[in-house]
Amino acid sequence: MFRPRFEPMNLPKDSNKPSTLMVLADRLNFISCAEGSSKYASKLFEGTLIDAEIMTNRARIEDLERRNRAAKAALEQLENMSATVPVHVSSALQTIEYPLETVIDVLDDLAQRAVQEKDIVGSYKTLDIRAPGEDVPANVIWIVKNGEPLTFNTDFQVDFLTTSFAIAGNGRLGFGSWFRALQTQLLDNNKAIARVLNVMGDTRISGRFMKTAIRALRSAMEIYAGTRQYSGFEATVLCLLHYSRSRQSASNIRHGLDVSIFEDALRHVPTYLNYMLEDIRAEWGSVTFSFDRSKLPVNFFSPIDGRKYSNGVFDPHIVYQLLKRTGTLSTTVRDITKETLLPIDPDFVRFDDPIAALSISFFPSRRTPLILHEDDPLVRTVIDSISLLLVLQKLMFNSNVYTSTHLNRFQPSAFFELPLGTQSEQEAAKWPVAPGSRPQATASTFDDNGQDMASRDNNLFFLFEKYVVPMYRYDNRCEVTGFFPGLAALCITGRVKGIPTAVRLGEYYSSLCNLIELDLRKTSHVGSGAAAVLAVHDSLTGDVEEGVSRLLEVFDAKKAFERNIEDIQRGV
């Protein structure tokens, strides 16, 4: 009945496995019943031996854990690789884009030259010369009386640059050392721009740089934040018209004030500017053309949290004071409460918005009036635009367009550079005359009696009639600096008292250079975001704003303009 200690014991037989013997490692004897030993033995070892199914499940779990760790490591490696893919792709795209852009420019030049070769009299695809008396289409402009009408296709300034570079061919084409200094500074700050401009190891001015620089200057008065039905230039003309009308009695409306269409108002802008200049001269002792900059946003033109600046931000500016005084900018509850106004204006006429009524009368198809007093950034643009037009009026007053074509910046031939150190008319006569220029032999600065002719505002009237009106008709979203990008360049230079040294050039023109660089490297700045572009553009607008205020506040404005124009022509 009892088995001796350590005697081998037969385990229960399995149909699939052979019989085995096992010795129990126990110091005690093993007691079991003789009958049914296999049955009891199987129950005894059931709780101590590891079942095969349990082993299989654990192995599966460990295998899954290993696979999970391997998959996680692979995902981490893939994530690290994917982070470097955009950098390599961007670099590869740039190496492809730069040659393609160069090829496109070359093809454009070849196409332009092919058109020029077909023209016998020298008419060009983008710049056409018409004889006086011909019917003038909508896309024809005229700069000066002794010039010729010029035709453009899509954009006058860009077409003019394209044609000028095509005419020059491999010869030298100059736009003043100021632009050349800007290009040099741009290349010094970023060597990669040289490939974009295709001026590797070359000192010539780049056509692409000039187009980008002009585009940047044209955008100086554009409001990048928000959408509006009316441009700042349209609001400016409406304000000037109402301001001039308010100075005249209803029974004594002078020439230029009784207009029914907007283009007629455009033609008489010089008249409106004279009305404002008369009032400014009357208060010259206390005049300032600056805002309260402590209440303006630091890095942006428009308010960050809405469409309103802090109260009193425009108050110091003489243009704002005159517009408020004549009711051109209507009174708002921010200026005075109705309870305070009731005793002196019971009908609340001062709350009426005359600009809204004018906008609907001139632009009925837009169906939305211009509520100017509710849009502070647009009010600021109007004040800046009027200031820029006052600069233009002072610059062109009694201007002479009949001087030497190479010494007169009103003539296109002035952009074809003279030999280094040559300024004489004898040397200038050796150079070809560009389209739109009048030969020196026909130029005259005297009338039939030999008396000096005072042009006064005649050249400005002609410019608005033959240049601004056609340009506006072609693009009614154009701002003041879009018509006159040179004004922006003049004001950027004019904001500096004296002439900065070459070492300090960058800090005065960094905003313009930064905007040009952003435009040239569009693909590289995709990730910079709209805020960065907005900050750079608004910095340029602030520089122009600062420059125009200083130029209008100097005592001898004409002399200051001449100095700044010399700076632009020869570089700073």
UniProtKB/Swiss-Prot annotation:
One of its GO terms (biological process) is symbiont entry into host cell. It is found in: Virion; Host nucleus. The keyword Isomerase does not apply. Residues 1-58 are annotated as: Interaction with major capsid protein/MCP. One of its GO terms (cellular component) is host cell nucleus. Coiled coil: none annotated. It comes from the Viruses. Pfam families: Herpes_UL25 (PF01499). The keyword Hydrolase does not apply. InterPro entries: Herpes_UL25. Keywords: Capsid protein, Host nucleus, Host-virus interaction, Viral genome packaging, Viral penetration into host nucleus, Viral release from host cell, Virion, Virus entry into host cell. Belongs to the herpesviridae CVC2 protein family. Capsid vertex-specific component that plays a role during viral DNA encapsidation, assuring correct genome cleavage and presumably stabilizing capsids that contain full-length viral genomes. Participates in the interaction between the capsid and the tegument through interaction with the large tegument protein/LTP. HAMAP family: HSV_CVC2 (MF_04025). Heterodimerizes with CVC1. Interacts with major capsid protein/MCP and triplex capsid protein 1/TRX1 at the pentamer vertices. Interacts with the large tegument protein/LTP. This is Capsid vertex component 2.
